[in-house]
């Protein structure tokens, strides 16, 4: 065997032993009957060093606008800014048109009576400007139809009140109350009204006094009392001398006396200097030793007797 053949066989054996793990590839190419050419291809070499970056290509066309992203969470509330400077005061507006009077609704207890109501109690009435009021209607006394605006009966309510309280009204529907001077003005500002005072002493003796042309002025005139004449009643007249006087309270002195009559006689009334009646005075339960500071009616039981029940009421004048 020639040396060339031996070399060839050795190469074949080596190739078989590393066929699965090595990369060389051996090819035998026949040239002639007696000559063979062997080609051995080796493994790939180590990668070379990367070449330099080529020049940038031209900019691509602008893409379409994407969809809006999900809104983020609201941030924390910022600090409150300082109050700005007040602007100039605007001009006073024009006076509005008068409201439409309420049609078909009772404006006093007499109208309720005319519509068939016959039981004394609390009813809703309307002033000429449409204000609704709940009032006590006396449907029995002297033909009925009276609005009761003052009642004393048990001493459960303090009547030594200030101006604002008498303006707005106070008390309880089931016992003692004052309807309110502002309401009295609104209810008597139009028309003519009769006034009636009903008194009951602790012996259950009942007396009364009546007057014509009752009216109460506005607050700007201190709720001045207007009266016509004394028209009768067995209690006698202890109010006519108070006509044309403003209303006085412990904190608003409109009387003719150097001192406050309201403070001195513990009440609130159309005092002169000072009074012949004091039906908003202290509830002293009959005879009392103090002078003129009870629920007094001079022409009735005098200055030292405080009545058990007092009711002051009015209705349209026939």
Swiss-Prot record:
A GO molecular function annotation here is: carbohydrate binding
Q: Where is the Fibrinogen C-terminal domain?
A: 100-318
Q: Which Pfam families match?
A: Collagen (PF01391), Fibrinogen_C (PF00147)
Q: Localized where?
A: Secreted
Q: Can you give the residue ranges of the Collagen-like domain?
A: 42-99
Q: How is it modified after translation?
A: N-glycosylated.
GO annotation terms (biological process): complement activation, lectin pathway
What broad class describes the main subcellular location of this protein?
secreted
Complex and partners? Homotrimer. May form higher-order oligomers.
Q: What is this protein called?
A: Ficolin-1-B
Originating organism: Xenopus laevis (African clawed frog)
């Amino acid at each position: 065997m020639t040396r060339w053949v031996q070399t060839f066989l050795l190469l074949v054996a080596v190739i078989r032993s590393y066929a699965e793990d090595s990369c060389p590839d051996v090819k035998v190419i026949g040239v002639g009957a007696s000559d063979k050419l062997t080609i051995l291809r080796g493994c790939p070499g180590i990668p070379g060093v990367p070449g330099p970056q080529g020049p940038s290509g031209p900019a691509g066309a602008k893409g379409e606008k994407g969809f809006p992203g999900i809104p983020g969470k609201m941030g924390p509330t910022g600090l409150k800014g300082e109050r700005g400077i007040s602007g100039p005061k605007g001009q006073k507006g024009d006076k509005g048109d008068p409201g439409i009077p309420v049609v078909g609704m009772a404006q006093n207890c007499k109208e309720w009576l005319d519509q068939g109501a016959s039981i004394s109690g609390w009813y809703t009435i309307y002033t000429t400007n449409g204000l609704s009021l709940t009032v006590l209607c006396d449907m029995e006394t002297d033909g009925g139809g009276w609005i009761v605006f003052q009642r004393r009966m048990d001493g459960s309510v303090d009547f030594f009140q200030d101006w604002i309280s008498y303006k707005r009204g106070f008390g309880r529907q089931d016992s003692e109350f004052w309807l309110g001077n502002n309401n009295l003005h609104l209810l008597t500002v139009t028309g003519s009204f009769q006034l009636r005072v009903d008194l009951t002493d602790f012996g259950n003796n009942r007396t009364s006094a009546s007057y014509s042309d009752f009216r109460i002025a506005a607050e700007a005139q201190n709720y001045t009392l207007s009266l016509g004449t004394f028209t009768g009643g067995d209690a006698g007249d202890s109010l006519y001398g108070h006509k044309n006087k403003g209303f006085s309270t412990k904190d608003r002195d409109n009387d003719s006396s150097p001192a406050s009559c309201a403070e001195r006689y513990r009440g609130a009334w159309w005092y002169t200097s000072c009074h012949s009646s004091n039906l908003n005075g202290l509830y002293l339960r009959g005879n009392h030793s103090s002078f003129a500071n009870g629920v007094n009616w001079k022409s009735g039981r005098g200055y030292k007797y405080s009545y058990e029940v007092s009711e002051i009421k009015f209705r349209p004048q026939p």
